[in-house]
Amino acid sequence: LKQRSLLLFENGIKSEATKVEYLKNLNRFKDFYKLKDYDSILGIDGRKLQEMVEDYVMDMKTKLSPNTIPTRIYPLQAFFEINDIDLKWRKIRRLFPAKVKKSGRRAYSTEQVQVILNNCHDLRNKAIVLFMASSGCRVGAFPYLKLKDIHPIENCKQVMIYSDDIEEYTTFLTPEASKAFDDYLEKRKKDGEYLDENSPAFRKTYRLGLEKAKSVTERTVSEMMQRVLKNSGLRENKTGARYEIQRDHGLRKRFDTIIKQTDNMKLIHAEKMFGHSTPSIPLDETYADFSVESLFNEYKKAIPELTVNDSERNKIKLDAQNKKITQLEVKTARIDDLERRMRVMEKSN
């Protein structure tokens, strides 16, 4: 049975994704002091506990980025407060180092993503990279993705990220990424796996397809990206302690950059597909249409540039041009027909 202190902590967090992250950081504190369990933390004298948290902050200042430390402490505050332990949090926050300008804000270029894909030697890894590149999802979304969250829409796919969670949002896959995902699922079926709506979208490596499928973890995806980047030679330039492009987030940044620079893209829809809330939107946009159809119509505008393969992108652009030509020809034919009818009417009069 779970200890009551942990049950209170978990029940006080609404978002499943946040719960996982907070628990991870609570465990870091517990392991740092080699504490037996969660309830034993609460048995420590308040003054001693205050010193422990302060020392923990000062230790992290010698090891971690200044921007990381608050994210390690806020979960502790949530745990202690919901268990009625009062610490001097203002004093603790005064120990935080000054934040620094974040490095690693650059996005992967399309050419770099091509290199990454060339170093993905199995269908799963290729599908994961294209999934992130075309949907903009965080690496932390993968453990929660089920097949029921992914549905065909035209020649693309609709994806529900963090479904049934307060952070739920809709994004999409390009035709290129959709095909890679379908190829990966087909491989799993051929290996003997029975797929249903509750099957993980991406499963851990397996020897036999019949084995019970377990979702990939965030660590699995991150370590895969680390290996691929090392093999591709793309992890060389550092800014201080960080690389210019974040390992996983560089794909999400690429999505964000492309979709917001797309001609005639509605920014508020772009933010929704990126999983951002929009508290500062103008009043007249608070009633904007965020239906799947509306979001997909905006997403389609960005498909050519989100597509990684050059020949696929050129094919999409050519198809779009041919569609415009066909529409123009139909319009011209209608005008010609209308003019012909008018001439016939004039002659009859």
PLM feature spans:
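Active-site/catalytic core of tyrosine-dependent DNA strand-transfer enzymes
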Residues: P175-R242
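Conserved tyrosine-mediated DNA breakage-rejoining catalytic core shared by Y-recombinases
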Residues: Y144-K190, E197
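Basic, Lys/Arg- and aromatic-enriched nucleic-acid-binding interface segment
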Residues: T110-V139, R252
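Short, charged phosphate-coordinating catalytic segments
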Residues: M132-N155, L267-K272
